[in-house]
């Protein structure tokens, strides 16, 4: 997680779309594998 956050901080503004895509992937992983998925991923 920390490594992903550092990479996002170093990402130029023009790559913000890629940053959002990475965030979505991380969110999916959290939803699939975390016990907090009920709290974080309710529509």
Swiss-Prot record:
2,3-didehydroalanine (Ser) modifications at: 27, 37
Pfam families on file: RamS
Keyword Heme: no
Domain of life: Bacteria
Post-translational events: Maturation involves the enzymatic conversion of Ser into dehydrated AA and the formation of thioether bonds with cysteine. This is followed by membrane translocation and cleavage of the modified precursor.
Function summary: Lanthionine-containing peptide devoid of antibiotic properties, involved in the formation of aerial mycelium. Suggested to self-assemble at air-water interfaces, thus providing a film of surfactant through which nascent aerial hyphae can emerge. The aerial hyphae differentiate further into spores.
NCBIfam families: lanthi_III_b, SapB_AmfS_lanti
Protein name: Lanthionine-containing peptide SapB
């Amino acid at each position: 997680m920390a490594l992903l956050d550092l990479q996002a901080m170093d990402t130029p503004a023009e790559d913000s779309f890629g940053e959002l895509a990475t965030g979505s992937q991380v969110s999916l992983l959290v939803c699939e594998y975390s016990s907090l998925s009920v709290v974080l991923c309710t529509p």
